[in-house]
Structures are given as structure tokens and as C-alpha cells.
């Protein structure tokens, strides 16, 4: 018995006990040590007996028996001969499954280079030998000789020789030197390398060299050499002399019916290798001519290449059906490869799938499960119960009963299923709410019934969607399903913290209908004692549902102790609202119910309920809302008839007016007054406006009706038109869709996105004619094509996001940092896009928040801001708060809970072990399909209107100016002379209300700190030209303004005024090239004037195209324009929107024409120009002058002599995130990416919390470039994980050494995923071959920190409930390391006796367990 226990133990070797996976190069000896024998023959199985051939690819002697515990010849059978090796056939008697583990090997007659290390760029062999790949290939494939040992000759080691050169050299020096070809030569060179010496040489070279490219190349080689030294890999192992053979059950040969066999491609590839190898051996024995041997060696090299990576070099070897054979590399890479097909995406047992239908009577935690499915899924449980209760004596009998579907089986099934949660999943699972747990209710029929409120989370509808069912088997799994995944625990969305269990469609319509009020309804003005009486009155037909009445309402309000106290008031309300109040949970205010409830209001109800009362009452309330909504939607009898689409009478006159305008424009075009482009834009504008007017008339018509009230007076009220109610409540449809039903369809777009200028004037009620229908099909088809593309693109974005963020887990409570990011309300122009409270809700404060204007602490640091504290912030009008952020978190491999803040789906501080990276990726990726794929073309008409020329304030308050320089002109107005001036309006409490950017040269009517009133225009400027503003008063003196050389004179025909236009440098005659046209201001005596407060002469250089309207010696006053520079009217710009924009931001792509930012602070000047570029110089107060070449066509925002700050805009354009990071730091780049991504989502009405985007930004900022390495393990210019540098720096600080300096680097998400520390994760993402090659050469260790690596190696992930498990494991390891225990032999025996189990004991304890399980039920 002892043996059996031992044996069973040995069978289930636990693979849990490892912490690191290391990858490296296998030495020939290692390959031989894995092997169980050499494969000598290419045969597979005997065609007569179907037994494996001896020494062949399936040999039983090498790989193990074909049948369990039976040798090949049949001499030994059964368990008792276990471990015997049969003397006849040489097969060990053991289990068949060893054929999945035992490897063989092939001794190669000639060395062969491993194609991965040769061809995977950069070629490792090439890098080591410092030879180009082309040359190495010529040696390997027998085209050239390579000198291995030059001896006393004047050849160099590693020099290539052609046939002729080799023969010449042999004639000349005989056997003084040694040159070879093929893999032997490369192997010899690699073997001869002295790695430490080579490293020394390279280090010296690195010190001496100055060229950047050379440095890069040397650093690369140095890293590779050091990797070899550290990992203990030998370079010559990249050339193989022994080839391992995969176990045969992993490349099976399967008999098909009809006597044919299906085989794995690998067998073909191995056969080729063995054939060629054997032939080569024979040729070598026969001492065949060199050329034949050489050819055979080349073929061997090619066949091994094909086995390892078919198609990497030359043409892929194809099988009998012209299809390339699948090599070892193909097995692991790509979507169908081992990683993504079998390790990251496994199929699951105990699962089923079926169509879903509605279950309107279910509770939120229930789902309807068809009896048939349940019976099949819970089979093992039913068998166990049948046996333990004595209905069946054996499993077989139980099976029979289940198949016969005896009556008792159904009773037991009901018992088994009770409180056993099951998981429902709808593909595509875009976020974690795509899998939720429910308690099953057995139902007749074959469709799964789903609760309507969870449809939003699953994105399910009932038009034929299918869902999968999974059964959690173990007790732990059931517990987790119930505690974490139950639908009742997932009320809030993890993306934004708002309820995701919200009613839609019918329910919304029902509640809206129920809470509407009506003028002069039956029984208006009644007094009712409570909602019960209201319901009674309604049921007996005394009142209508919408009648306005007075009802006594009892609300429950929490007192100081936190207990509910009733408060009763008489309230003006309607019957419907009073009835709805009956389902309200205790503690909700009636005011929330006493309104017409649309979709938003209902969502707010559930949110308030959750925040005030917690989960349980909210879930019950949500269910009640649903039942009530369905009931009253049925009562309302809303239906859509054609007469509900009321066409406004004004429609036809609006359309005819528009047609007249269009005809007029057409006439203007034909007489040449407007260009074709202008005509097109104007026509489209006219029709767009007409469409708006029709829509407005239609909505006015639809949305209100006139009724007679109790006094007999006419009164307007909201209409009870069904279509209007559906749109108004948010149940279905929108104003835009109603416009197409009853207004006019309007303008349609062509598939390329341009607008067709003839609109569809008909609507769907009138019907479209053939032409109109044809035009409208354009748009519809494009919509469908877009959707398909969008889904794929969005899925790929999600995959990249998950991959980059998967290893980010909350691993500690507080990292103790004082850093954070400053949050302010998002204000664009005159409106608040997002209030401060919405941005900081659920964050932790990084520094004490003070009451504005005092030193009083409102909120202490490290406090989590909840709704109550946000109210405090609001009431004290705080307008900026420093909150902690994931980006500034100091935790090394992960983040801390304090920096993350609130768990949005639960409403409290996030727990340790939460996988915030994956949550963030899913939250950003899930709405991806709702984003557009389009690039928006803005027509000329639209972009012309977009240029503002003044600022009109919307709120009364105080005006504030930031980064401002100005001069005051004669009229007392301010003229700006600074570039990025920001103007804000602040209210009486000091809150920012409006925020504008004001351009250079704008004229302000109010100054800093002055009061402004709403509607006042505070600034205006000319949008088409940029002035050069005089900063002093004086007389104009022209410098280098020479007619014909640098300027031309133009006279305006209409006004007769003449102006001077400065020529571009390129257009000037040679004599004028070096002249620098400028205007200097002098006083009456002709002396220079200095700009006040500086020692700079008032002299203004004029760029090309500048227009001067003054004459020489004219008098100018301060603040007047000296010249104007026309701003080139920017044509139609494409704005990348939607998904592509989000992808660009996360991939950190550089825009086409990026903005140019100042690299340092200093004074701007221009140096010598080249053909197409100008030289911009920035001279700082001290230090080196910085210079940059800028293309001439870029419009610059700075003049000569102007002061700029580091990071200021020099030329407009889209900013590059890399520049922002380099010049303005981590905070600025975070803010930029977060705001830009949010902009796209906000446009689509999708809410995502900022912190999800910050999580991704943190992952993009994981790496840094070492700038000063000192004597650390890093190389300068090396890309390293920031966390690693921080760890090293902490150590160095303790030792008192100087700290390693580094610059943060921003990587796009794909790059960042591939640059992750874990090679397993990177390999399973993209470019598998390259990643594995790199990892093997460097002998990388994978610490298995992330989720992906752990899923792949089959362990619990270190997140969620697995987080604690891994922590405990590590604690145990540490403890066992600390306490070595030595036992005496007697002790050991005693312990062994205690642990020995007899068969009786085992049976007894098993029975006991089953009984316990029974009792538990």
C-alpha cells in the first residue's frame, strides 16, 4: 500500500514549486542528456504491423511503449513488470504517456548553424563575429572560404576568400594558413572568441570614439558579449552538432479510415534531416569528392533550417499539396500558435451554449437554465448524490438513471443546483462584466433566460444572441463566483463608477409614462392620505395616472445616530409618482421621484440608492423598478402609427426658400463671382441650415400640444405622442431619427466622406423616390463596411492595451510618495467641460487641501475623496487640488492602493491584488467599437467660421491674465506682446469659470484684476494677419528696406494706398540675400531708443511676406502695429478622430508636421540660412547656444530678439508627446495624453475615468535611457526599466555612491509590450521568434511577475485571490530557507508511520467526506 501511495504521489508531480523560468542555449551535451537514444532511421511505422520501426522516428525503445505497461513484442504485460526493460525488443515497461516527454536526438555529421541566431535580425552570430549577415551566409552555404588561422601569411582572421583566391593562396603559402567553409568554419571562429578580452577592447574603443553611430554599434555588441558572459552561454552553441527530436506523441501519426495516415508536418521535416544526415555520413565514410560532400552539407543545413523555421530563408519547403510545411517556429507563433491558441485561450470542460431570451420575471441574481442543459452540466454531481443517497449502487447504474431521466433525477438535480452559481459569458467578452455569475432556475424549453437589466453589461440583445454557460466545480470556485462575480455585486461599471445595471427601452418608457403629468386630468386636485390610496383611486378608475394631486408622503431621513426617522409632508405630485414611491427603499428622498423620469434620471436614482443605502437595497430596488416599468409600459399602450409622424406645415416653404438661395448662388458662380469650392460650401451650408429649421419646426410641432385647463384657459403641455415620448424618455430613438421620419432626411455623404450637395428633401413618412433612395444607399453601405473594420481595429487596440498593462497589480497599501498631479476643472472657452469634483472623486489627496485664502486645512493628505468631501470642495470653491496618481507612484513592480484611489466598481479604496492594468485596458478598449473610424474632413466653409477674432465673456467676474507681456497704447487699451497668454475669468469665490488663449497683438479692453460683466467683449484681434507691435513711441527708420532688392511696393487699386511687401529670401536677387530688413525706432534726434526695462534696442526684423504700411521717418505711438504678417489661411485640414486617434496617442506616434518647441530658455535669433531651411539660434543667459534647422515653409511664432522659455511653441502644429516629455516632464505628458484621449471619448459621449488612461501612460513610461552610468551595471545610452534603476540607486545611496542618472522615455504600447521584462509575455504578444532568440542569447530569467506569464505556465495569477496565495508561498519559502531542520532516523520513521495510509483508512475518510457533504446540504 505504501508503494501505491508513493506511486500516486510520484504521478502527480506538482509543477507549482518554481519562481523563475530561465531560457538559454542548449549545449550539445545537454541535448544528449535529455535524449533517450539516437534516431538513426527516417522510417516511422511498419506498413504491415503498424508497429513503430526500431531506431526510427517513433521507435518504442527510445521513446517508450505504445500501450500502457506492455513492451513491443508482448513478452511483458501488466503493472507487475513495471520498470523492466524487455531483453528482446529493448522497450521499458511503463506508461504510454512517457511518449509525450521523452526526447531523442540526431548526431549531425556536420555542424549546422541555428537559423534563428543567424537570420533573426539583428543576427546574433553576425553581431558576435562583427561580420555582415551576407558574408556569414556565403560561408555557411558554401560560396566562400573564411580564414580561421592566418598563420604567418598576410591574410586576416575572418577574411572571406572566393574559390580562386583560396586556390591562389594555397599555391602561395601551402598549408601555412587555415581557411574553411560551412558551419564548421563559423563554429571554429565562435569557439576561438575570447569574450572577456573582446569586452575590454570594446570598452576602450567606446571611450575613444566620438561618432554616434559607432557608439551605438559598439554598445550593441558590448551588451551581447556581456549577456553571453553573464548567462554562461557559449557562442559556439549557436551552431548545432546535435539536433534534439521532439517526443513522438507531440508530432503524432494518426491512422485515418481507409488505411491512410495523417501525419504532423514535423515528421516530414525530420525525415528530410535524417535522410540527408545519413547520406552525408556515408559520403564522408567513402571519402567522396569535396564538391559532393559540400553540396550534401549545404542541403543538411537547409533541411535543418526548414525544420526550425520553414520559409525564413529561401523558398519554404512544401508538402504533397503545395502547402508550406509547418515548422517548429510556426508551432509557437501567431494566433494559431501554441501561445495564443492553447496557453492563453483554452477551451473549457463543463460548459454549454444556447440562445438567450428575456426573463422579465427573474431576480437580478438569477438566470433561467434549460433542464436539459443543467442535467448534462451537473452530471458528476448528480451521480455522486444518487450514490450517496443509495438510489444507485454504482456509477454505471447512476448513469443509466440519468439517461432514462427518472423522476428522482429531477429532484436531485434541483437539489444539486440549489445555490450553485453558474457563469454566463457572452462573446465578445470586451470587459470583465462579459462574464457574470447567476443562480440557475430550471426552466422548460431550450433557451437560456437572461435578466433584462444585465443586458447592458453583456451588450446582449435577443435577436438570436447566444451565450455560454460554465460550471464552477470546486468549492473555492463557487465561493469566488458568488462573492466576486455575482451579477448583484457588479452594479457599477469599472470604467467610470456609474451604475451599469440601468433600465433601458420598455422599462424607461413605462416609468416615463407613469411619472408624466397632464393638465386637467381626471380627478385633478384631489387630496389623498397616502400612496396606497392613490393606487386604489387609480385602480378603481377615479383618477388618471397623470393627474396632478396632493398626497401625504412619508420619507425616512437619517438622524444624528444614523437611524431612520419618518417625516410626513403633503406634496404636490401625480398619481403615477405616488404609486412609484411605494417601491422606493427607505432613506431615499421623494424629490428624486417627483419629476418626469427619463433614462438619465432613473440612472441617477439607482446611483443615489447605491451611494446612500449600499448594495442590497439597491439591487432589490432595481428589480422593482424593472417590474414596475414593464407593467406600466404595457398599460401605456404606446405604439407607433404613421399618423404619429407629424410633418410640419412650414416644411415646404422652408425648402422652397432654400432652393431659391441655391439658384442664386448658382447664378453667382456662373457669372464668376464665387469659385466652385465656395459655391459647394455655401450650398451645403444652406441645406444644413434648412434641415435644422425643418427639424426645429417639426420638434415644436411634435413635442407640445395645447389643452384646456380647469379654468377653461388654453395651456401648453408636453405631448403624449408615442414617438415623441420614446425619444424624450431616452427609451429608443433620438431627435435626429425623428427628423428623418417626419422632417427631411437631409444631406448624405459619399463613401469617401464628402457630402453630396443635393439633399434628400423627403422623409420616411412621405417615402423616397428612386433617386433619393439610391443616394441614401451610399451612406448605409459605408456604415456596414465601417462597422466590420471598426470591430477588428478596436479588438486589436484592446489586445495591445491589455498586453502592455497586464502586469500592473496593486501590491501594497501606500508607497509613501508626496508627488501627484494637480487637478483643475477642465474648461474650454466659456464652458466647463468637466467640473473639478468629477475629476477628483475617488482619488487620494497628495497634499493638505487648504481653505482658499486661509491656512485652515479642509482635507488632510492621504484622504480618499468621496461624494461628501467633494461637496466640501464645492462649497469652499477650491479650484485646484493635488491628487496622487498612478503615474507618480513609487512602488517598484506594481502600484499602491493610495495612488490608485477608489475601486470604481465597488466604491471603496481599492484592494491589494486588484489587476488594475487589465481593468484599465478593458475600460479603454471596450467602448472602442462605439468610436468612429473616420477622419473628419472640414470643408472650407466650416473652417473659415472656426477662426475667432474676439473674446466675449459669458460670466460676470474678475479677469486674470497669465504669462502676459503688454504695452498700453494711446487709448489706454492693452496690446499684447507675449505669445501664449492665457485669459481666465474668476467668479467671486475664486473659481475659474472661463479659460481662453489670446494671440500676440490682441487688443484688450480690460487689464489683469479688473471686473468684467457677462456679454462684454474683452479682447479682439485680426484673425488673418499677425501684427508686429511697437513697444515704444518714436520715429520709423528703415534698415535694409531697399526697393527691388528686399522689398516690392504694391498699390491697392481701390484705395490708392501703397504698401511695402518684404520679399522672401528665396525670391530676392543675389545682392539682397544677406540683407536683414528691419524697422528701427529712433527719437526726434535720430538716437536709438531702448525698450523700457532692458538694454535692447527697439529694432524689429521683418520676416518674408510682411506688409509695411508706414513710410520712412513716420511717427509711431506705443502699441501701434509697424507691419502685418499675413497668416496663410490654413486649407481644409483633416482631423484624425475616433479610434485611429486613440491608437496614435497610445502608440506615441509622431504627427506628420509636429509643433517645434524651444529646447532651452533664451533669446531667439536667426543664423545663416541654407537652401530650404533657416537656422534658429537660442542663446541662454549662460551656457551653450542651441541651434536647430527649420524648414522655410514652417510658419514661426517668434521674432528675432524675443525671449522664449523651454518648451514654448516656436512653430504651430500637433505636439509630439516625446517632446512634451523631454521638455516639460512627466506631468505634462500625462496631462496631454489623458486630455487628448478623453477628448475623443467625450465626443462620442463615453465616460471613462482618467485613472485608466494614467495606468496606460505609466506603462508607456516604464523605460528610461541611462545618461550617466558611473560604475553601475548599466551602460550609458542603454534602455532600462525605471524600477531597476531606482532599486540600484537606493543601494548606491546607502553606500554613498553617486546615483545613476537617466531620462524617462515614452514608448508606444506595442514597443512597451515587447520591451517588457518578461520574455514569456513578450513572446506571446508579437514577433515570437525575435523575442525568444534575444531571450535565449541573454539567458534571460522570467520572474513570472505579470498575469500573462503565470497563465502561460499554468499557475494561479498573482492577482485577486491568487495574490494572497503567492504571497503566502513566498513567505513559506523564506521561512524554510531560514530554518534548516535535521531529523534523526527514528523521528523520520515515526513521521512516516503517521503519514502511511491503509486502504481501510482511505475508504473510511472518503465516506466521511461524502457524508459531511451530504450533511452540509
Swiss-Prot record:
* E.C. number(s) listed in UniProt: 2.7.7.6
Per UniProt, Mg(2+) binds at 461, 463, 465
Query: What keywords sit in the KW lines?
Result: DNA-directed RNA polymerase, Magnesium, Metal-binding, Nucleotidyltransferase, Transcription, Transferase, Zinc
SMART domains annotated for this entry? RPOLA_N
Q: Which GO terms describe its molecular function?
A: DNA binding; DNA-directed RNA polymerase activity; magnesium ion binding; zinc ion binding
Binding of Zn(2+) 1, residues: 71, 73, 86, 89
Cited PANTHER family: DNA-DIRECTED RNA POLYMERASE, DNA-DIRECTED RNA POLYMERASE SUBUNIT BETA
- Protein name listed in UniProt: DNA-directed RNA polymerase subunit beta'
Amino acid at each position: 500500500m505504501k508503494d501505491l501511495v508513493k506511486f500516486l504521489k510520484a504521478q502527480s508531480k506538482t509543477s507549482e514549486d518554481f519562481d523563475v523560468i530561465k531560457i538559454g542555449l542548449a549545449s550539445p551535451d545537454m541535448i544528449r542528456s535529455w535524449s533517450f537514444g539516437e534516431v538513426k532511421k527516417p522510417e516511422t511505422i511498419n506498413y504491415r504491423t503498424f508497429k513503430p520501426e526500431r531506431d526510427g522516428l517513433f521507435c518504442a525503445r527510445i521513446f517508450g511503449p505504445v500501450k500502457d505497461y506492455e513492451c513491443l513484442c508482448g513478452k511483458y504485460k501488466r503493472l507487475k513488470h513495471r520498470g523492466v526493460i524487455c531483453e528482446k525488443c529493448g522497450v521499458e515497461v511503463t506508461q504510454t504517456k512517457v511518449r509525450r516527454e521523452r526526447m531523442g536526438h540526431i548526431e549531425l555529421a556536420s555542424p549546422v548553424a541555428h537559423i534563428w541566431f543567424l537570420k533573426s535580425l539583428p543576427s546574433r552570430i553576425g553581431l558576435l563575429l562583427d561580420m555582415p549577415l551576407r558574408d556569414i551566409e556565403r560561408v555557411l552555404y558554401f560560396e566562400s572560404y573564411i580564414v580561421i588561422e592566418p598563420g604567418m601569411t598576410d591574410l586576416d582572421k575572418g577574411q572571406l576568400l572566393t574559390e580562386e583566391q583560396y586556390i591562389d593562396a594555397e599555391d602561395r603559402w601551402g598549408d601555412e594558413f587555415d581557411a574553411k567553409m560551412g558551419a564548421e568554419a563559423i563554429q571554429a571562429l565562435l569557439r576561438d572568441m575570447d569574450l572577456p578580452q573582446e569586452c575590454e577592447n570594446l570598452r576602450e574603443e567606446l571611450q575613444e570614439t566620438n561618432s554616434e553611430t559607432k557608439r551605438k554599434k559598439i554598445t550593441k555588441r558590448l551588451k551581447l558579449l556581456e549577456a553571453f558572459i553573464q548567462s554562461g552561454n557559449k557562442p559556439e552553441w549557436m551552431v548545432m552538432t546535435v539536433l534534439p527530436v521532439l517526443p513522438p506523441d507531440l508530432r503524432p501519426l494518426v491512422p485515418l479510415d481507409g488505411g491512410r495516415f495523417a501525419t504532423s508536418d514535423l515528421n516530414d521535416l525530420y525525415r528530410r534531416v535524417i535522410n540527408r544526415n545519413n547520406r552525408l555520413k556515408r559520403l564522408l565514410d567513402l571519402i567522396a569528392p569535396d564538391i559532393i560532400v559540400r553540396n550534401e552539407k549545404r542541403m543538411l543545413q537547409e533541411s535543418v533550417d526548414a525544420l526550425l523555421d520553414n520559409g525564413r530563408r529561401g523558398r519554404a519547403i512544401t508538402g504533397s499539396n503545395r502547402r508550406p510545411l509547418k515548422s517548429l517556429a510556426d508551432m509557437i507563433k501567431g494566433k494559431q500558435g501554441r501561445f495564443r491558441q492553447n496557453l492563453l485561450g483554452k477551451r473549457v470542460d463543463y460548459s454549454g451554449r444556447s440562445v438567450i431570451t428575456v426573463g422579465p420575471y427573474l431576480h437580478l441574481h438569477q438566470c433561467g437554465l434549460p433542464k436539459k442543459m443543467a442535467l448534462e452540466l451537473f452530471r458528476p454531481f448528480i451521480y455522486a448524490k444518487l450514490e450517496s443517497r443509495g438510489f444507485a449502487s454504482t456509477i454505471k447504474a447512476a448513469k443509466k438513471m440519468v439517461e432514462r431521466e427518472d423522476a428522482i433525477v429531477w429532484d436531485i438535480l434541483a437539489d444539486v443546483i440549489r445555490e450553485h452559481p453558474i457563469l454566463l459569458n457572452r462573446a465578445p467578452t470586451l470587459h470583465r462584466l462579459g462574464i457574470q455569475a447567476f443562480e440557475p432556475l430550471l426552466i422548460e424549453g431550450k433557451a437560456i433566460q437572461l435578466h433584462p437589466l444585465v443586458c447592458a453589461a453583456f451588450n446582449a440583445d435577443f435577436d438570436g444572441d447566444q451565450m455560454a454557460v460554465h460550471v464552477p466545480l470546486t468549492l473555492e470556485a463557487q465561493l469566488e463566483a458568488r462573492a466576486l462575480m455575482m451579477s448583484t455585486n457588479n452594479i457599477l461599471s469599472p470604467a467610470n463608477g456609474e451604475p451599469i445595471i440601468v433600465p433601458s427601452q420598455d422599462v424607461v418608457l413605462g416609468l416615463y409614462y407613469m411619472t408624466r403629468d397632464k393638465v386637467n386630468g381626471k380627478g385633478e386636485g384631489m387630496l389623498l392620505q397616502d400612496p396606497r390610496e392613490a393606487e386604489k383611486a387609480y385602480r378603481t378608475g377615479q383618477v388618471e395616472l397623470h393627474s396632478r394631486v396632493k398626497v401625504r408622503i412619508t420619507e425616512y431621513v437619517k438622524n444624528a445616530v444614523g437611524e431612520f426617522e419618518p417625516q410626513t409632508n403633503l406634496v404636490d405630485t401625480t398619481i403615477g409618482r405616488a404609486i412609484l414611491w411605494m417601491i422606493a427603499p427607505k432613506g431615499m428622498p421623494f424629490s428624486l421621484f417627483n419629476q418626469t423620469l427619463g433614462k438619465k434620471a432613473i440612472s441617477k436614482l439607482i446611483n443615489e440608492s447605491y451611494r446612500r443605502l449600499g448594495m442590497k437595497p439597491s439591487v432589490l430596488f432595481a428589480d422593482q423598478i424593472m417590474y414596475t416599468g414593464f407593467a406600466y409600459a404595457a398599460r401605456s399602450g404606446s405604439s407607433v402609427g404613421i399618423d404619429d409622424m407629424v410633418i410640419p406645415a412650414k416644411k415646404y416653404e422652408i425648402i422652397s426658400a432654400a432652393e431659391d438661395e441655391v439658384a442664386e448662388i448658382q447664378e453667382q458662380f456662373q457669372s464668376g463671382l464665387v469659385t466652385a469650392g465656395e459655391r459647394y460650401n455655401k450650398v451645403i451650408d444652406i441645406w444644413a441650415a434648412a434641415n435644422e429649421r425643418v427639424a426645429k419646426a417639426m420638434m415644436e410641432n411634435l413635442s407640445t400640444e395645447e389643452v384646456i385647463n380647469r379654468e377653461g384657459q388654453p395651456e401648453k403641455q408636453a405631448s403624449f405622442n408615442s414617438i415623441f415620448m420614446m425619444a424624450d424618455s431616452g427609451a429608443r430613438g433620438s431627435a435626429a431619427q425623428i427628423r428623418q421620419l417626419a422632417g427631411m432626411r437631409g444631406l448624405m455623404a459619399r463613401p469617401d466622406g464628402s457630402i453630396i450637395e443635393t439633399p434628400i428633401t423627403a422623409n420616411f413618412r412621405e417615402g423616397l423616390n428612386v433617386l433619393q433612395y439610391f443616394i441614401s444607399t451610399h451612406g448605409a453601405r459605408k456604415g456596414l463596411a465601417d462597422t466590420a473594420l471598426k470591430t477588428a481595429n478596436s479588438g486589436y487596440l484592446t489586445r495591445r492595451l491589455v498586453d502592455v498593462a497586464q502586469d500592473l497589480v496593486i501590491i501594497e497599501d501606500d508607497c509613501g510618495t508626496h508627488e501627484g498631479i494637480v487637478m483643475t476643472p477642465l474648461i474650454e472657452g466659456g464652458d466647463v467641460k468637466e467640473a473639478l469634483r468629477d475629476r477628483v472623486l475617488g482619488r487620494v489627496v497628495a497634499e493638505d487641501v487648504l481653505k482658499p485664502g486661509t491656512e485652515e486645512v479642509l482635507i488632510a493628505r492621504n484622504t480618499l475623496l468621496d461624494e461628501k468631501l467633494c461637496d466640501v470642495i464645492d462649497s469652499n470653491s477650491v479650484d485646484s487640488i493635488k491628487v496622487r496618481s498612478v503615474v507618480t507612484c513609487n512602488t517598484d513592480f506594481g502600484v499602491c492602493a493610495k495612488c490608485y484611489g477608489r475601486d470604481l466598481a465597488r466604491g471603496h479604496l481599492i484592494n491589494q491584488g486588484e489587476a488594475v492594468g487589465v481593468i484599465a485596458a478593458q475600460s479603454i478598449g471596450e467602448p472602442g467599437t462605439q468610436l468612429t473610424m473616420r477622419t473628419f474632413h472640414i470643408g472650407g466653409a466650416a473652417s473659415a467660421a472656426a477662426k475667432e477674432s474676439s473674446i466675449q465673456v459669458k460670466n460676470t467676474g474678475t479677469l486674470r491674465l497669465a504669462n502676459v507681456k503688454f504695452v498700453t497704447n494711446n487709448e489706454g487699451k492693452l496690446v499684447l506682446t507675449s505669445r501664449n497668454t492665457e485669459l481666465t475669468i474668476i467668479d467671486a469665490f475664486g473659481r475659474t469659470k472661463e479659460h481662453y488663449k489670446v494671440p500676440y497683438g490682441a487688443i484688450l479692453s480690460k487689464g489683469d484684476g479688473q471686473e468684467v460683466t457677462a456679454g462684454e467683449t474683452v479682447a479682439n484681434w485680426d484673425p488673418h494677419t499677425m501684427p508686429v507691435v511697437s513697444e515704444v513711441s518714436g520715429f520709423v527708420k528703415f534698415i535694409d528696406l531697399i526697393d527691388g532688392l528686399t522689398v516690392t511696393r504694391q498699390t491697392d487699386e481701390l484705395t490708392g494706398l501703397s504698401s511695402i511687401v518684404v520679399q522672401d529670401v528665396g525670391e530676392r536677387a543675389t545682392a539682397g540675400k544677406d540683407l536683414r530688413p528691419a524697422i528701427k525706432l529712433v527719437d526726434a534726434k535720430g538716437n536709438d531708443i531702448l525698450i523700457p526695462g532692458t538694454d535692447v534696442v527697439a529694432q524689429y526684423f521683418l520676416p518674408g511676406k510682411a506688409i509695411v504700411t508706414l513710410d520712412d521717418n513716420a511717427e509711431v505711438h506705443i502699441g501701434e502695429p509697424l507691419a502685418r504678417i499675413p497668416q496663410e489661411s490654413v486649407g481644409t485640414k483633416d482631423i484624425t478622430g475616433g479610434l485611429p486617434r486613440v491608437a496614435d496617442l497610445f502608440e506615441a506616434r509622431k504627427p506628420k508636421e509636429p509643433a517645434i518647441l524651444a529646447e532651452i530658455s533664451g533669446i531667439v535669433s536667426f543664423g545663416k540660412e541654407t537652401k530650404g531651411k533657416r537656422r534658429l539660434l537660442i542663446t541662454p543667459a549662460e551656457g551653450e547656444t542651441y541651434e536647430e534647422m527649420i524648414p522655410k515653409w514652417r510658419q514661426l511664432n517668434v521674432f528675432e530678439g524675443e525671449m522664449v522659455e523651454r518648451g514654448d511653441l516656436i512653430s504651430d502644429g500637433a505636439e509630439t508627446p516625446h517632446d512634451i516629455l523631454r521638455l516639460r516632464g512627466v506631468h505634462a505628458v500625462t496631462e496631454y495624453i489623458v486630455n487628448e484621449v478623453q477628448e475623443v471619448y467625450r465626443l462620442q459621449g463615453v465616460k471613462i475615468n482618467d485613472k485608466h488612461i494614467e495606468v496606460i501612460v505609466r506603462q508607456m513610461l516604464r523605460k528610461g535611457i541611462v545618461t550617466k552610468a558611473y560604475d553601475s551595471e548599466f551602460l550609458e545610452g542603454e534602455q532600462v526599466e525605471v524600477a531597476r534603476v531606482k532599486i540600484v540607486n537606493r543601494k548606491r545611496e546607502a553606500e554613498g555612491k553617486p546615483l545613476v542618472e537617466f531620462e524617462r522615455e515614452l514608448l508606444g504600447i506595442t514597443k512597451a509590450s515587447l520591451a517588457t521584462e518578461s520574455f514569456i509575455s513578450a513572446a506571446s504578444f508579437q514577433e515570437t521568434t525575435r523575442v525568444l532568440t534575444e531571450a535565449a542569447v541573454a539567458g534571460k530569467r522570467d520572474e513570472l511577475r505579470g498575469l500573462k506569464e503565470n497563465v502561460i505556465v499554468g499557475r494561479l495569477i498573482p492577482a485577486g485571490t491568487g495574490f494572497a496565495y503567492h504571497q503566502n508561498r513566498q513567505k513559506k519559502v523564506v521561512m524554510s530557507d531560514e530554518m534548516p531542520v535535521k531529523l534523526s532516523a527514528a523521528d523520520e520513521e515515526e513521521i512516516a508511520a503517521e503519514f502511511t495510509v491503509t486502504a481501510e483508512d482511505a475508504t473510511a475518510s472518503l465516506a466521511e467526506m461524502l457524508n459531511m457533504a451530504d450533511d452540509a446540504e
